[in-house]
Amino acid sequence: MTYRLEITETCLSLIEKVTDKRIQSAIIDRIEGLKADPEKKGKVLVKELANFRSIHVAGRYRVIYRIDEDSSIVGVLAAGIRKEGDQKDIYRIAKKLLKAGLLDSEISR
């Protein structure tokens, strides 16, 4: 089954902030790869980010996404570097955006 991608403006903005163009390209390639069998890629997240999945890109970079099986949509919510304990950690950013309601307002469930 082929899925349609919906990428949030927030995610696009986060990708633009990645200074290494090779990593930007790798992120985009991994996102494109989510069109086919996204449920077999990445891992299921827990706690505040339950119902989301994360896929490794290059090094410590991650893409956070959600699958809507009913409408065959992969919602790509955020992308960035994993820096545990840092303010710029992609999971920390995603949690803040989710709490602020910004992720849910940008993409359908």
PLM region spans:
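Arg/Lys-rich, positively charged N-terminal/basic patches that mediate binding to nucleic acids
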Residues: 1-28, 104-109
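Enriched for short, Lys/Arg-rich terminal
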Residues: 4, 13, 57, 66-109
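Residues that form or immediately flank small-molecule/cofactor binding pockets and catalytic motifs
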Residues: 10, 50, 81
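Hydrophobic pocket-lining residues within nucleotide cofactor-binding pockets
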Residues: 18, 45, 49, 79
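Internal amphipathic alpha-helical segments of the cytochrome P450 catalytic fold
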Residues: 24, 41-42, 73
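A short, surface-exposed loop/turn module that caps and links secondary-structure elements
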Residues: 32-57
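Histidine-centered metal-chelating micro-motifs
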Residues: 61-63
